[in-house]
UniProtKB/Swiss-Prot annotation:
Quaternary structure and interacting proteins, as annotated: Homodimer; disulfide-linked.
Family: Belongs to the alternative oxidase family.
Organism of derivation: Neurospora crassa (strain ATCC 24698 / 74-OR23-1A / CBS 708.71 / DSM 1257 / FGSC 987)
GO CC annotation: mitochondrial inner membrane; mitochondrion
Subcellular location as annotated: Mitochondrion inner membrane
Effect of residue 173 to D: In aod-1-6 mutant; alternative oxidase deficiency
Cofactor annotation: Fe cation
Protein name per the record: Alternative oxidase, mitochondrial
Membrane topology: Multi-pass membrane protein
Enzyme class at the top of the EC tree: oxidoreductase
Amino acid sequence: MNTPKVNILHAPGQAAQLSRALISTCHTRPLLLAGSRVATSLHPTQTNLSSPSPRNFSTTSVTRLKDFFPAKETAYIRQTPPAWPHHGWTEEEMTSVVPEHRKPETVGDWLAWKLVRICRWATDIATGIRPEQQVDKHHPTTATSADKPLTEAQWLVRFIFLESIAGVPGMVAGMLRHLHSLRRLKRDNGWIETLLEESYNERMHLLTFMKMCEPGLLMKTLILGAQGVFFNAMFLSYLISPKITHRFVGYLEEEAVHTYTRCIREIEEGHLPKWSDEKFEIPEMAVRYWRMPEGKRTMKDLIHYIRADEAVHRGVNHTLSNLDQKEDPNPFVSDYKEGEGGRRPVNPALKPTGFERAEVIG
């Protein structure tokens, strides 16, 4: 039995050039992009049309990736459902999400914003984004057009790198607030659960993309280093100033919304033909987690769901940054009074700059 071929991609400095080669040729020649093995199958051959197509994209031989996290077979357990089931999104909610930026108002806001810009710069380098693929630097969080689009391979590398560290802030904040609650012998007023759920949701984004892309040694090394630095930085930052840290995460989620919005635009404009192909299948775990209906399971639909999640994190963290970090309850899980001016906050995905304290606490 022949071993299936897998396209190999790494070397971030040559990402754009090598990714172009991936699209323009029909060869299974090894390519390198940030240490990732990307499964690529766009048009199945005539002999394979009758068999189920794999969740990948290749133009020559059918490529299959090993399952990085197969379910462990046990004598009694059939499956383990998500600890936090996703509530799902309506199409109107998803299409209403737009990139937006909250202007810094304090020194802490300004510091958080500048740190995010540094992170964006480092991520662009790590994932091989070339100057001609950059958006307008005067409007980096809202501009979504560039002189040259990214390729599918570049997008997957970028998604995996971003999502591998995006799950860190919620876990760090939830852990520290949990320990703080134990030390003070006081309730946390609903913050911990929201923060941990955010971290869990980001991890599901990562696992979904890993079903389409196998990280190579270089990518794993970059992720290991980035996560180690980011975890410790978030840990110290949250101990010093939770308010600034939540603002930082809010700005970070603005970048995430911008990233996925640009990807959606490039799919719609036909720059990513493999993801526009009707035969392309998204991972089954994504269909189950987001409860995606029949007829709404394209790559574009998947990115819409993930972008809506990121928009929620954006609104939640900007709101939490506006609150009293020690005393205020979490407005997104609280029951509100009726008839006394109190009002439940609307979907945070639709409030890009977050709610001010007076709007949700009084």
